[in-house]
Design a protein with these regions (language model features):
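Bacterial N-terminal signal peptides that target proteins for export
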Residues: 1-7
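Cleaved targeting-peptide boundary
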Residues: 20-27
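Acidic/histidine-rich, surface-exposed loop or edge segments in extracytoplasmic proteins
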Residues: 31-45, 82-87
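Structural recognition of the beta-strand scaffold that forms the well-ordered cores
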Residues: 38-41, 79-82, 114-117, 157-158
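Histidine-anchored nucleotide/phosphate-binding helix
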Residues: 52-71
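Acidic helix-start/capping segments at beta-turn-to-alpha-helix junctions
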Residues: 71-90
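A cross-taxonomic marker for long C-terminal extensions/tails that follow the last structured domain
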Residues: 91-172
Length: 172
């Protein structure tokens, strides 16, 4: 009798676990996104973080430009405000050191992304407006610029760029 009870309990448990696993899985959603208005606040403690921060722009644009949304870039209104150490990445004299990031920014600018540098930060770093690339606009202040765009209904995104200490395979 004990043997039959054990087999019976095992079968019930196995059946219920199998059914539970089939019913409890994630699924893909298609959020009905509309045209985007976003202002990014770039303020980093290391200019090398600019390259990683640019992936935040890609992560907004690519899903919206791909299926099922197929939005044209002109329906994505994106402004990037630069006012930390990363300001050196958009100074023309530093092209060789930051050329990969510069070319990615130039590409995004060709899609309509606006890049604004804080005039106060530019002054603090000793840069005149002509020190920057043709796709850069110099605003009076990053803080007033961020407030302005938020008051116009833009969503504020402040990228957090961490140092990668583990590969995905190490922690998966």
């Amino acid at each position: 009798m004990t043997y039959l009870r054990t087999v019976f309990m095992f079968m019930i448990t196995a059946t219920s676990l199998t059914g539970w696993a089939d019913d409890k899985v994630s699924h893909v959603v298609q959020t009905p996104y509309s045209e985007q208005k976003v202002v990014y606040d770039f303020y980093f403690d290391n200019p090398e973080k600019m390259a990683s921060a640019l992936f935040w722009i890609r992560s907004l644009m690519n899903p919206l430009m791909d299926d099922p949304y197929n939005m044209a870039p002109e329906f994505l209104d994106i402004v990037v405000v630069i006012h930390g150490t990363e300001i050196v990445t958009v100074a023309r004299k530093n092209y060789e050191r930051y050329k990969d990031a510069v070319e990615r920014m130039r590409y995004y600018a060709s899609l309509g992304v606006k890049f604004r540098v804080c005039g106060i930060a530019a002054h603090d770093y000793g840069y005149e407006p002509d020190a920057f690339y043709e796709f850069i606009e110099v605003a009076p202040s990053a803080i007033t610029e961020l407030a302005h765009w938020q008051l116009q209904g833009y969503a504020l995104i402040t990228p957090t760029v961490m140092e990668k200490r583990f590969s995905i395979d190490e922690i998966r």
